[in-house]
Amino acid sequence: MGGDYVLSILIDKPGGITVEDTAQLTDVVSPLLDTIQPDPFPEQYMLEVSSPGLERPLKTAEALSNAVGSYINVSLYKSIDKVKIFEGDLLSFDGETLTIDYMDKTRHKTVDIPYQTVAKARLAVKL
């Protein structure tokens, strides 16, 4: 179904996305796409509406600000105390520094990470 063309729409909102949210948006968007002239999809296509996922990347300062209070994974360009990957609760982010509460073996520790040293950041699932 859908040939080789896929139109993917990612949606998000505070509190997360439900299956009902994706179904409702699909029901609204699909008929509207059919009214566009000239048709941007002359061949059959598949419409895919979904959320960015549980482990979505945090690519901007705004995304990190919105993730305060969430469990995240951060990879660094430069290690801090010989550690390049931290996973824990993002306690704060002021635009320049991330503060993360993480487990070091059996103890909670807090680390301040300069934003410019962050290579990648994403939400993480706490197991």
From Swiss-Prot:
Subcellular location: Cytoplasm
GO biological process, alphabetically ordered: ribosomal small subunit assembly; translation
CC per GO annotation: cytosol
Annotated SUPFAM superfamilies: YhbC-like, C-terminal domain (SSF74942), YhbC-like, N-terminal domain (SSF75420)
Principal location class: cytoplasm
Keywords tagged on the record: Cytoplasm, Ribosome biogenesis
Pfam families referenced in this protein's UniProt entry, alphabetically: DUF150_C, RimP_N
InterPro entries linked: Ribosome_maturation_RimP, RimP_C, RimP_C_sf, RimP_N, RimP_N_sf
Function: Required for maturation of 30S ribosomal subunits.
PANTHER family assigned to the protein according to its UniProt record, in alphabetical order: RIBOSOME MATURATION FACTOR RIMP
Family: Belongs to the RimP family.
UniProt name for this protein: Ribosome maturation factor RimP
Organism encoding this protein: Streptococcus agalactiae serotype Ia (strain ATCC 27591 / A909 / CDC SS700)
